[in-house]
């Protein structure tokens, strides 16, 4: 019987990875042994502090494996009421005797309405955790909180994932042990010679063997880091995951603004061992094709790539159709030229950079048709693709008027949409937003409404702010929109407005229906597709049955 009991506990130990915190609490009540050996250690192992509760469902396991400490679950709530619940739950966490069980702790940004009191409480929590020095991953996304706790953070010896801000972050690197993940955030004016001395470089090469590196440069010139690494003859021969950002800016006289160049990059990183690559990039300079040249120079070396992410970043040409189309051409040409792309690529993420209100330049319908045909040519070749992540696809599509009108007037005719779409039509007819370029209020049109909707849905996943490739490792937050805010939205004085957060859930369902034709196409051309996330709408796909369903909407 002892062996049988041991086998049962092994099974439960593995199965508990898929249980959410409510299930783990239920499991802890079954027996003292189950409580002490499985439920409690698993419950405290990975804690994520979020402003809003996460969406729950029995259809998926995104909320499994983590304990979420969150605010008030209600459609209608105020910031101070949410603070009360979140503050109390963090205090209860501080009082527990199980803090030593915490191996991973993630603290999101802007958690509290009362920021000063919230930061004091969070600093207490971080101090307690760092004093124990057993944590393996401490992700503090609020820069102010990180600065308050940075001295203790950098002295932690057990971290497997590390974040470095600015110049002094590497000072204690000799004390670090066994870290396999590094996120380095560089200030624009950082002098690399003062930071990466040769012994630091040697330590990075050793520790990141088989690991991941993310470089986030405030100047959007991450390639300068690899040029400096090359000057020190540093070589990363076995990186598995890499993320960087680089923009060749229009009319920028900054010394840190530079063309995308692959020379040093290819010498420093052994691209043939990369499994995951995420690039935030663009070239905004007229008659320059450095982004295309860069990608074509590296594509032949990426023989092991299974996960690929692209993020468009623009400064002076946000919303310019021809900028977006050029970027799409560069990205899709790169994808087509990847070695064994049909056999190897499993995950693809593409995020565009649309304007807040969706209004762009040259966004006529024929231009979008060209962009759609481009993706229709490339996507069918990705026959092994299992996951598609497109965080801004709603805004990208509906910035073209015909498609925005389809959403409201010519789209889904089901009973649900037929009931609610006229209400949102009435919203549009009675609300305005403030246009800064025009210096006056303008009527909300379908393009603007769809863009605000996409931005609101993005709040489900935007607090994660790490890799887009990892967005499906987090449960989406239960967020809403009150149909005001953004660009000073207001309604006409003669109109009695009844739109608030309670109207958002039907709108999310309407958006999920809007994506049905796109999902019908994707499951037809991608035989191994299993999941997609389109602008905060999550779909699960059955490749065997060629069917799909929305998870939360």
UniProtKB/Swiss-Prot annotation:
Main localization of the protein described in the UniProt heading: cytoplasm
Compartments, as annotated in UniProt: Cytoplasm; Nucleus; Cytoplasmic vesicle membrane
**UniProt keyword list:** Cytoplasm, Cytoplasmic vesicle, Membrane, Nucleus
- Under what conditions is it induced? Expression is RSF1 and RSF2 dependent.
- Any stretches that span the bilayer, and where are they? none
Q: Could you tell me the Gene Ontology terms of the biological process aspect for this record?
A: endocytosis; protein targeting to vacuole
Q: Which residues form the F-box domain?
A: 3-49
Membrane topology according to the record:
Peripheral membrane protein
Query: Would you say which domain of life the source belongs to?
Result: Eukaryota
Gene Ontology, cellular component aspect: cytoplasm; cytoplasmic vesicle membrane; endoplasmic reticulum; nucleus
> Molecular function terms in GO for this entry?
GTPase inhibitor activity
Q: What else is known?
A: Present with 3080 molecules/cell in log phase SD medium.
Q: What is known of its domains?
A: The F-box domain is required for interaction with SKP1 and defense against methylmercury toxicity.
Report quaternary structure and partners: Interacts with SKP1 and YPT32; SKP1 is required for the interaction with YPT32.
The job of this chain, per UniProt, is described as: Non-SCF-type F-box protein involved in the endocytic with the vacuolar sorting pathway. Acts as a repressor of YPT52 by inhibiting the formation of active, GTP-bound, YPT52. Involved in the defense mechanism against methylmercury toxicity.
Q: What is this protein called?
A: Non-SCF-type F-box protein ROY1
The organism of origin for this protein = Saccharomyces cerevisiae (strain ATCC 204508 / S288c) (Baker's yeast)
Q: What is the lineage of its organism?
A: Eukaryota, Fungi, Dikarya, Ascomycota, Saccharomycotina
């Amino acid at each position: 019987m002892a062996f049988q009991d041991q086998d049962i506990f092994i099974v439960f130990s593995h199965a508990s990875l898929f249980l959410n915190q409510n299930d783990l609490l239920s499991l802890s009540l079954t027996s003292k042994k189950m409580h002490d050996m499985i439920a409690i250690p698993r419950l405290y192992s990975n804690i994520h502090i979020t402003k809003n509760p996460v969406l729950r469902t029995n259809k998926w396991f995104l909320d499994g494996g983590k304990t979420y400490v969150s605010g008030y679950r209600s459609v209608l709530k105020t910031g101070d009421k949410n603070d009360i619940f979140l503050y109390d739950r963090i205090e209860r966490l501080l009082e527990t005797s199980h803090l030593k069980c915490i191996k991973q702790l993630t603290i999101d940004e802007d958690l509290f309405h009362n920021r000063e009191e919230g930061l004091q409480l969070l600093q207490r929590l971080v101090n307690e955790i760092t004093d124990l020095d057993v944590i393996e991953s401490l992700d503090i996304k609020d820069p102010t909180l990180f600065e308050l706790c940075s001295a203790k953070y950098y002295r932690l010896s057990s971290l497997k994932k590390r974040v470095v801000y600015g110049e002094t972050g590497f000072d204690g690197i000799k004390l670090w042990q066994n870290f396999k993940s590094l996120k380095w955030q560089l200030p624009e004016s950082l002098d690399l010679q003062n930071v990466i001395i040769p012994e630091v470089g040697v330590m990075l090469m050793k520790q990141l063997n088989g690991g991941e590196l993310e470089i986030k440069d405030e100047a959007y010139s991450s390639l300068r880091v690899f040029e400096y690494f090359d000057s020190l003859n540093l070589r990363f021969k076995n990186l598995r995951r890499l993320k960087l950002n680089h923009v060749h800016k229009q009319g920028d006289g900054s010394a840190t603004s530079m063309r995308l160049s692959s020379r040093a990059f290819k010498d420093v990183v052994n691209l043939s061992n990369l499994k995951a690559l995420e690039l935030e990039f663009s070239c905004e300079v007229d008659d320059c094709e450095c982004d295309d040249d860069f990608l074509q120079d590296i594509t032949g070396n990426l023989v092991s790539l299974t996960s690929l992410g692209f993020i468009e970043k623009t400064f002076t040409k946000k919303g310019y159709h021809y900028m977006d189309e050029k970027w799409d051409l560069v990205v899709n040409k790169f994808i087509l030229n990847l070695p064994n792309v049909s056999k190897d690529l499993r995950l693809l993420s593409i995020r565009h950079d649309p304007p807040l209100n969706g209004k762009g330049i040259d966004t006529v319908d024929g231009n979008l048709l060209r962009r759609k045909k481009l993706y229709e040519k490339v996507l069918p070749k990705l026959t092994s693709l299992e996951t598609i992540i497109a965080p801004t696809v709603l805004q990208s599509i509906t910035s073209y008027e015909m498609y925005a009108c389809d959403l409201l007037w010519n789209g889904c005719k089901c009973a649900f949409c037929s009931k609610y779409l006229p209400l949102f039509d009435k919203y549009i007819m009675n609300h305005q937003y403030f246009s800064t370029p025009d210096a006056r209020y303008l009527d909300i049109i379908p393009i603007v409404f769809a863009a605000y909707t996409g931005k609101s849905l993005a709040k489900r996943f935007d607090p994660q702010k790490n890799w887009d490739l990892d967005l499906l490792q987090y449960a989406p937050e239960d967020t809403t929109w009150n149909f005001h805010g953004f660009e000073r939205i207001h309604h006409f004085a003669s109109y009695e407005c009844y739109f608030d957060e309670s109207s958002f859930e039907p709108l999310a369902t309407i958006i999920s229906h809007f994506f049905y034709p796109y999902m019908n196409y994707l499951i037809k051309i991608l035989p191994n597709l299993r999941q997609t996330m389109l602008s905060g709408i999550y779909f699960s796909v059955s490749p065997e049955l060629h069917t799909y369903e929305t998870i939360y909407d």
